[in-house]
Regions:
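Acidic/His- and Gly-rich active-site-bordering loop/insert found
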Residues: 2-106
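Active-site alpha-helical elements of protease catalytic centers
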Residues: 105-119
Length: 119
């Protein structure tokens, strides 16, 4: 099986994940993560609705009205980093080392959000 690391879609996912990781969106801050995703989704024809619940922005991206409905759900905020000196790489740099993306939110949940948006 060949490597897919150089496919345009892979590059888009990684680039968006890095851009999201580089935004310091510590709870409850969004740091414009949703704006970044909404801009991409709007260019793809999605209708973006923003809703505030207390102090938290939530975005709904819809495309079409036909059934069945399908939903991706996630969050852009991350927990505090703790002592950043204990990190192998700065938590908000989005460093790729040995093919692994490092940073706060890479696994929960900014990497997954990037994959959802690009898909």
């Amino acid at each position: 099986m060949g490597s897919q690391n150089n496919t345009p879609q892979h590059s888009e996912v990684v680039s968006l994940a890095q851009a999201l990781i580089q935004k310091k969106s510590v709870t409850p801050e969004d740091a414009n993560c949703q704006a970044l995703m909404n801009e991409r989704l709007a260019k793809l024809g999605f209708n973006i609705e923003e809703h505030f619940f207390v102090d938290t922005l939530n975005s709904w991206a819809r495309k079409g009205t036909d059934s069945p409905h399908f939903c991706f759900a996630g969050h852009t905020d991350v927990v505090p980093t703790g002592d950043e000196n204990e990190w192998q790489h700065p938590p908000f740099d989005g460093v790729i080392e040995n093919g692994i993306l490092h940073g706060r939110g890479a696994a929960d949940m900014k990497g997954a959000l990037a994959a959802m948006v690009v898909a």
